[in-house]
């Protein structure tokens, strides 16, 4: 558990509390999965998809009540470390969004940050590397999903127009089973 807790201090790419972190072990994973080294030649096609609100379940599950805007930076500090958080916090991609009543709920920003950080950026980087090295990648983002069992435990995930993590599974699996 000590390694898990200190991962953010050991590797610049590691975030705080990431449960799964694939590593180049020379046996199962023989080359980096990011852009830090030349990618091996490939020829298999891949389907890589994400959903619009990947981090919605995690963020709204951890914080069921609205968060004040003042909570955004400390949560980013805890996730990315104090040296990297300012880049995220100052990005126009994660600017505060006013709700209809004029208030700001930091969960909105955190959901976008989480979706980008853990799903979208890593998927797109991997797809780009795959294609640049001979493979084909079909990349998509689901804007409509099929609510995955269990996602109803977080009210955000049951909202109109919301597609949370795993809401693509039954669609993708059914396509391949037919």
Regions found by a protein language model. Give the residues of each.
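Alpha/beta-hydrolase fold catalytic core
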Residues: 19, 81-133, 137-144
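Active-site rim elements
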Residues: 33-34, 101-117, 155-159, 176-178
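Substrate-access "cap/lid" subdomains that shape
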Residues: 1-67, 71, 109-132
